[in-house]
Amino acid sequence: MYAVIKTGGKQYRVQAGDLLVVEKLEGEPGAAVAFGEVLMLGEGEAVTVGAPTVDGAVVSGTLLETRKGEKVKIFKKIRRQGYRRTRGHRQFESVVRVTSVAGAGKEAKWEGTIDLTPKVILDARARGLGDAAVPATIPAPVEAAPAKAEAAPKKKAAPKKAAAKTEEGEA
């Protein structure tokens, strides 16, 4: 069973067990997410199209993480003027595991398990370092370096002598 849902201004075709990357959703990792705006349901040849949505249809999922997406580069240029500007932008996105598609008296569930292990630990395991290589907490801030010994004060230049006054009329 599959469904076409609308979220974040875009439409997605999903079925139970799919991993879905959508615009940013509010919530912590592991939170349940429900998409109520189901535009179409289908199973084999049987298709139910909503007008505009299918009544009573719900797609449920679990929020796995919220992250930044790929960088989009913005480049502006005015030729022959020496004007060039480069900027970048990374949009927030959420990763959702679809756990069930329900509607029209039917329901399709995903029977797998959801792993919320942080990416740092997964990377350490992939490199063969194991979980022991990953610190359990964020390390404490590094202490400030000891102050340097003060250097000897610089000698001041001797004041300039005033020019000798001459009296007029002396010869």
Swiss-Prot record:
Entry keyword annotation includes ATP-binding: no
Keyword annotations: Ribonucleoprotein, Ribosomal protein, RNA-binding, rRNA-binding
GO biological process, one term: translation
Molecular function per GO: rRNA binding; structural constituent of ribosome
Entry GO terms, CC: cytoplasm; ribonucleoprotein complex; ribosome
Listed Pfam families: Ribosomal_L21p
Sequence segments annotated as region (Disordered): 144-171
Function: This protein binds to 23S rRNA in the presence of protein L20.
Listed name of the protein: Large ribosomal subunit protein bL21
Gene behind this protein: rplU
